[in-house]
């Protein structure tokens, strides 16, 4: 047995007790935290072992078409992580120079619902390549060169209009694998323009949900992750993007368990970052709508008002209202105008609404 297979077995072994505990009183107290742990483990397992889930050959030279079709035959919530893993596996296999992966040939035939996952997976692969080649003590010039190559790699492989979806994951890779270079990489991204700086910190925020100190969802892990999202970036706008990215990750991973999202909502409300939470939640659910256009099962709980004491008023204000508005008044315009990748940057609801219905000829 290889080390990789042994690690997979260890993940599955941990999932057993987590599932059992989560089934006892789902969504309640510590049992909710076991649900959350299982969700994290499952998302990671499906991403990291997508090739095993689909029984792909070990030979890295394969087309994306067949694996994508196999992944789409899976249950939708599982498929999104497998698709991301497929693209990551494809982007890291071998030393070949990839070009036009999703913009020509087979890539043009892949359905819209796969674009979020596939661009994210490719971006993770390209970021890992670029940052992994830096060595142990890179100077600012070499970091800037690596970032420039990474951005170029993303742009020559993206479907038109989807650059942001593959560039944002460099923040995930930087924060999880190279935390000591977090600010130098951020400076290099900023040197290429404010839009890339925003994407970077959104990715950093997503990473904070998965770093070791926050991975096990016990002992106020949401509060710790939020504190990092507020303290690690150096500017207010970067903090908004980091909190939005963190909320995105919490929402997407725990989509079947709204109670987990409700806990994150409460923490964000207490810290006074409601707009960033709303953007992260709405953006994740807009992405989900793109990935699962026919879904009602998972989305429905986020559209249902709560009644009674406790968090009901907060839920209706921070979740039901914005999600209903986004579903009805924002998503159709983003899809029609090919701007779905804009959900990777913090924007207010008004800015999203405006962006959704701008002419394609206007700059973003």
Predicted feature descriptions by range:
Residues 1-364:
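Mature, well-folded catalytic/scaffold domains that follow N-terminal targeting or propeptide regions
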């Amino acid at each position: 047995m290889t080390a990789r297979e042994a690690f997979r077995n260890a993940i599955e072994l941990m999932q057993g007790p987590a599932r059992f505990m989560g089934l006892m009183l789902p969504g309640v107290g510590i049992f909710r935290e076991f649900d959350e742990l299982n969700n994290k483990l499952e998302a990671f397992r499906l991403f990291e072992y997508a090739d095993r889930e689909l029984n792909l050959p070990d030979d890295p030279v394969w087309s994306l078409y067949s694996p994508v079709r196999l992944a789409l035959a899976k249950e939708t919530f599982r498929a999104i992580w497998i698709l991301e893993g497929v693209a990551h596996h494809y982007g890291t296999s071998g030393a070949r120079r990839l070009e036009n992966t999703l913009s020509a040939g087979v890539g043009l035939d892949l359905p819209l619902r796969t674009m979020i996952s596939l661009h994210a997976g490719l971006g993770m692969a390209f970021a890992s390549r670029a940052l992994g080649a830096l060595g142990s003590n890179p100077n600012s010039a070499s970091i800037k060169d690596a970032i420039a190559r990474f951005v170029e790699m993303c742009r020559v492989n993206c479907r038109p209009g989807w650059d942001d979806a593959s560039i944002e994951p460099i923040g995930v890779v930087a924060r999880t694998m190279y935390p000591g270079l977090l600010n130098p990489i951020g400076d290099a991204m900023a040197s290429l323009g404010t839009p890339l700086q925003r994407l970077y910190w959104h990715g950093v925020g997503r990473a904070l949900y998965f770093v070791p100190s926050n991975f096990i969802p016990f002992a106020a892990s949401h509060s710790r992750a939020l504190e990092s999202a507020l303290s690690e970036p150096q500017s207010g706008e970067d903090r908004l993007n980091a909190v939005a990215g963190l909320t995105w990750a919490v929402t997407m991973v725990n989509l079947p368990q709204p109670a987990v999202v409700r806990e994150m909502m409460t923490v964000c409300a207490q810290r006074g970052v409601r707009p960033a939470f709303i953007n992260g939640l709405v953006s994740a659910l807009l992405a989900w709508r793109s990935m699962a256009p026919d879904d009602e099962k998972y989305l429905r709980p986020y559209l249902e008002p709560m009644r009674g004491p406790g968090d009901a008023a907060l839920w209706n204000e921070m979740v039901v209202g914005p999600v209903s508005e986004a579903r009805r008044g924002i998503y159709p315009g983003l899809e029609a105008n090919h701007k779905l990748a804009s959900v990777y940057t913090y924007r207010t609801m008004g800015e999203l609404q405006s962006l959704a219905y701008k002419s394609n000829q206007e700059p973003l």
